[in-house]
Amino acid sequence: MTDALTRIYVDADACPVKDEVYKVAERHHLPVTLVAGGFIRVPQHPLIERVAAGSGMDAADDWIAERIKPGDIVITADIPLASRCVKAGATAIAPNGKPFTEESIGMTLAVRNLMTDLRSTGEITGGPRAFSPRDRSTFLSALDSAIRRIARRRAAPT
């Protein structure tokens, strides 16, 4: 069991792995907070909390970033939110299982900004590839690994 101080935050509006988060969180007895711009349906469970952050631009992102702390985990595809959370000392994981780290977040943000610029000029069209079963499996592995890593860190003598 992991220290109850670890909380999993989910940027929930378009998250394709909410069910996987519920299962892993229940197995490790971790609280989950799903944050969305509006109402989302979540299972009734004492470990799961739903937050409607409001419809303002980046309202859900701001809500998460203002509360996340070292030892917490955020699930998001939003690279600027991931950057804010990593800077706060949290673990950030994309729904496809890709971890955002202090070492990778700068380059990831730069590539995101470049792609945004290229799309706005019409040089690139289309979006990311479809979410796959392999992405789901990679995500489950990444989340489980992150939880175990945080638990080891907290259990280590200081």
Curated annotation (Swiss-Prot):
Q: Entry's InterPro entries?
A: UPF0178
Q: What CDD domains does the annotation carry?
A: PIN_YqxD-like (cd18720)
The similarity annotation says: Belongs to the UPF0178 family.
Concerning PANTHER family, the annotation shows:
UPF0178 PROTEIN YAII
Question: What protein does this entry describe?
Answer: UPF0178 protein Rpal_2485
Its lineage reads: Bacteria, Pseudomonadati, Pseudomonadota, Alphaproteobacteria, Hyphomicrobiales
